[in-house]
Amino acid sequence: AVYEHDARREDRRVDVPGWRLGQATSLDAAIAAHMEQTERAFALPSWETRLDVPPWMRQIALVTTLHGMHYTGFIFNDYARQLEILRWMATQIVPERVLVFLSSWDGRYYWDYPNYTVPARMGGDAGFRRLITEARKLGFKMMPMFGTNAANRKQPVWSSIASGATYKIDGDLYNINWVDWNNDRHQDAWLTYMNLGADAWRNHLEGRIADMIERYGVDAYFLDIVGGHVNSTTGDMHEGTKRLVENLRTRFPSVLCVGEMPYDALHGFIPVYHAGNGARWHKYSRFFQHLSAPAAGRGSSGVHEWGFSRFNTETLGLSPAAIPTLQVVDDTFTKYRDVMAAIIARAKSRANIV
């Protein structure tokens, strides 16, 4: 067993928690014992009793991921095209049963983190406002994406949020340096991993999310990499994440928080994710499929850095453990509308929608 002290503390004395050794007849039994303690410690509610799930979310039968602008600046679907797609989808399924995930709505994927402003090339303020307003009039629920813990040091805002960077317990600055964004065969390191336990970063991100909710009236917000907990010297990341979510929930009680992937304690205050959908976690939360899942045709991952993988024409890429998810990249609507219709039909069948 290993105990790691809170990195933000410089205690001269450490009292290590006591360990209780037990015996279980199976892995599932051992996990069940762990989860009983976790449920008590972090107040994990069951899905059926959650108060942080708006009624509309319980009726969602389909999630569609509309891919926006790639890191390179290539645009898969601008705001006008996204609205055109949704208007067509409204002829295929009741829009109230659809959650629309707007990935990279805010400019170049990750490069423009953490500005979260509406880029002119995608259609500007007027185009984004029209997309949200008209889509919501149809009945769709709209959810833009935000990075929980990523900021580009080359953006002008960096000096005001730099104190929110993550430093690991050994003092190392933690950079997001594992992606080769420009395909030059070297990982790029202009992103720093940020810590919501630090006031400067949490206040910035909370302010940007709140502004988008107030300005455009979106129904939900998505926290990218929210499950990437790090024991940081600059603050308690878990408590900072919880504080951000609870602050926004207090201000906007009808707006849903969705995370990319969970760790066990996150289920206490985030009810929906798009990764980590093992059966045991359905007791607490619901899931849809990752934005990197291959789209119909070439199997593009859209804005995500993965690239390409095979699209399964038999399963249509749908997981039995997740809310059916429709990926829309640059050629999906023009070349593979029949596959879109087939995915929508399966989602309707699974939800018993006539």
Please identify what each model-predicted range represents.
Residues 1-99, 134, 138-141:
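Carbohydrate-recognition beta-sandwich/jelly-roll modules
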Residues 10-19, 63-72, 199-200, 206-209, ...:
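Active-site-proximal substrate-binding groove within the catalytic cores of carbohydrate-active enzymes
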Residues 29-33, 37-39, 77-81, 123-127, ...:
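Soluble or luminal CAZymes and related metallo-dependent hydrolases
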Residues 61-63, 97-99, 139-143, 219-222, ...:
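Structural preference for beta-strand elements that scaffold enzyme active sites
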Residues 64-169, 203:
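Aromatic- and glycine-enriched glycan-recognition loops and surfaces
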Residues 89, 98-106, 204-234:
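Active-site groove signature of glycoside hydrolases
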Residues 104-106, 148-152, 226-229, 261-265:
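Active-site-proximal loop/turn and secondary-structure-junction residues that shape catalytic pockets
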Residues 127-133, 144, 148-211, 215, ...:
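Active-site-adjacent "subsite" loops/lids of carbohydrate-active enzymes
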